[in-house]
Each structure stands twice: as C-alpha cells, then as structure tokens.
Amino acid sequence: MGVKLNICLLLLLVAIISSQGFNLRKKEDSKDEKPFGNYRRGSPCSNYEGSCTPNHIPCPPGSHECRQLPGCYPGVERCCCQY
C-alpha cells in the first residue's frame, strides 16, 4: 500500500509541474506591443493632449493633425491634437 501511495504522489507531482510549464508558455494577447493612438509620455504631442496615430488612418473626429508637434515615430505615425 505504501508503494501505491508513493506512485500516486509522484504522478500528482509530475502532473502539477507539467501544468505549470504549460501555463508559462501561453502567449498573453492582452498586451499589444504598439497600440494605435497610444500616448507617448513626455513628448510635445502628448503634452498638448495629442495622440500618435498611424499615417494611413485619419485623425479621430474632433481632432486635427499637428505637424508642428514631434513625439511620434517619424514616417510611421503623426500627432493628432484635440480642437
């Protein structure tokens, strides 16, 4: 009986360790590396309540392009400021 208990405990331990390793390999989709319209802290664009928007997407309603404000990735994004 002692041998069966040891085998059961060993199998339980292996199952727990295996499931923990599987959880570590899951990709977290909630974190986006470069979200649209994110605010660059401390940049002139964000200081004037602007947001960096990709060049191929128009500025959101109620905002306009602020060419004079840097702070977004050049050639990829532009600053869209509130009116």
From Swiss-Prot:
Q: Hey, what's the signal peptide range on this chain? A: 1-21
Q: What is its main location?
A: secreted
Q: Which UniProt keywords apply?
A: Cleavage on pair of basic residues, Disulfide bond, Nematocyst, Neurotoxin, Secreted, Signal, Toxin
Q: Name one GO molecular function term.
A: toxin activity
Q: Please give the residues making up the propeptide in this record.
A: 22-39
Localization per Swiss-Prot or TrEMBL: Secreted; Nematocyst
Compositional bias, Basic and acidic residues, is annotated for 25-35
Which segments carry the region annotation Disordered? 25-44
Q: What GO cellular-component annotations does this UniProt entry give?
A: extracellular region; nematocyst
* Taxonomy, superkingdom: Eukaryota
The protein's job, in short, is: This recombinant protein induces severe neurotoxicity on zebrafish larvae (Danio rerio) at a concentration of 230 mg/ml, but does not show toxicity when injected in blowfly larvae (Sarcophaga falculata). All fish incubated with this protein died within 16 hours of exposure. Has also been claimed to be implied in calcification, but this function seems improbable.
Its recorded name reads Small cysteine-rich protein 3
- Give the classification, highest ranks: Eukaryota, Metazoa, Cnidaria, Anthozoa, Hexacorallia
